[in-house]
Amino acid sequence: MDIILWLQAVILGLVQGMTEFLPISSTAHLILFSDLLGWKSIWHKTALDAMQFGSVIAVLGYFWQDIHQIVQGSWQAWQRRDWQREEWKLLLGITVGTIPALAAGLLLKLAKVELDRPQIIATMAIAMAILLGLAEQWGSRKRTYQDIGILDGFLVGCGQMIALLPGASRSGSTLAAALALGLERPTAARFSFLLGIPTLTIATLVQAKDVFDEGTLLIPLVIATLSSMVFSYLAIAWLLQFLQRHSTWVFIWYRIGLGSALWGAIALGSLQS
């Protein structure tokens, strides 16, 4: 039984890590993957929370130099009253952009709204594909880090708010918003990741109690977290490299195919609410 749990932990961590930071929705894949394999026990729900730790550690580790530079540069800007400094504008953009998702997430939690339904996942998979396609088609892709300001942070943060709907994808919604605002692809992806750090970290801390309550399954939870951390790091590195030379159309078509397949499965009764 232990070996089976450990294997499940590795697989779930792989799915979480490879989909959390790609614009294809980790929540959708984890929910559907668990549903198809019959992994819907309390342990698996706890594992989903634990794996967020792995993703947070990965993104913090990958962007540690960026974070250090933003904090240091912002402190220097504060001392010199240099409000046009790049790091200061980035910090303000990230701070303001974090507010919409946190506010919406708090409201959903207080209202105890359940959104993890196959119909919502399938709909959002296709809807976000359309939005990402429009952003890819019409975005100018000329703006860089130097051009990012508070308004950009707020608007991309509103995109992050959409990711509260399963199937939308935090990476997909923020990437679409950033591209629509004219940011070049690598800059859009990098800003998307940096903007997600506060939200992911806070959400993970909120879920921490559920993880630590599951003390009897500590080893599988640690394995799932480590697996998620490794594959999250690899996914971040791969996506940033990929977007240096390619568009997001491969993800757009993937989402359309995924959403269509899900609706087919729902129609056939393979996926239940």
UniProtKB/Swiss-Prot annotation:
Q: Does the keyword Ion transport apply?
A: no
This entry's Gene Ontology molecular function terms read: undecaprenyl-diphosphatase activity
Q: What class of enzyme is it?
A: hydrolase
The record's annotation in Pfam families points to: BacA (PF02673)
Tell me the keywords, alphabetical order: Antibiotic resistance, Cell inner membrane, Cell membrane, Cell shape, Cell wall biogenesis/degradation, Hydrolase, Membrane, Peptidoglycan synthesis, Transmembrane, Transmembrane helix
**TM regions (residue ranges):** 3-23, 47-67, 90-110, 120-140, 148-168, 186-206, 217-237, 249-269
Q: Which InterPro entries did the record assign? A: UppP
State the Gene Ontology BP annotations: cell wall organization; peptidoglycan biosynthetic process; regulation of cell shape; response to antibiotic
Which topology term describes how it sits in the membrane? Multi-pass membrane protein
Where located? Answer: Cell inner membrane
| Known catalytic reactions | di-trans,octa-cis-undecaprenyl diphosphate + H2O = di-trans,octa-cis-undecaprenyl phosphate + phosphate + H(+)
Q: What is its EC number?
A: 3.6.1.27
Other comments? Bacitracin is thought to be involved in the inhibition of peptidoglycan synthesis by sequestering undecaprenyl diphosphate, thereby reducing the pool of lipid carrier available.
User: What is the protein's known function?
Assistant: Catalyzes the dephosphorylation of undecaprenyl diphosphate (UPP). Confers resistance to bacitracin.
PANTHER family recorded for this chain?
UNDECAPRENYL-DIPHOSPHATASE
Query: What is the recorded name of this protein?
Result: Undecaprenyl-diphosphatase
Organism annotation: Thermosynechococcus vestitus (strain NIES-2133 / IAM M-273 / BP-1)
